[in-house]
Swiss-Prot record:
Purpose of the protein: This peptide both inhibits the activity of the angiotensin-converting enzyme (ACE) and enhances the action of bradykinin by inhibiting the peptidases that inactivate it. It acts as an indirect hypotensive agent.
UniProt keywords, alphabetically: Hypotensive agent, Metalloenzyme inhibitor, Metalloprotease inhibitor, Protease inhibitor, Pyrrolidone carboxylic acid, Secreted, Toxin
GO molecular function: peptidase inhibitor activity; toxin activity
Positions carrying Pyrrolidone carboxylic acid: 1
Lineage top rank: taxon: Eukaryota
Signal peptide region: none
GO cellular component, one term: extracellular region
Organism the protein comes from: Bothrops jararaca (Jararaca)
Manganese found in the keyword field: no
Record-level GO BP terms: regulation of blood pressure
Record protein name field: Bradykinin-potentiating peptide 13b
Cellular compartments annotated: Secreted
């Protein structure tokens, strides 16, 4: 998962 701003390392979709 990814693409959404999260408090941590963002994983690209």
């Amino acid at each position: 998962q990814g693409g959404l701003p999260r408090p941590g390392p963002e994983i690209p979709p």
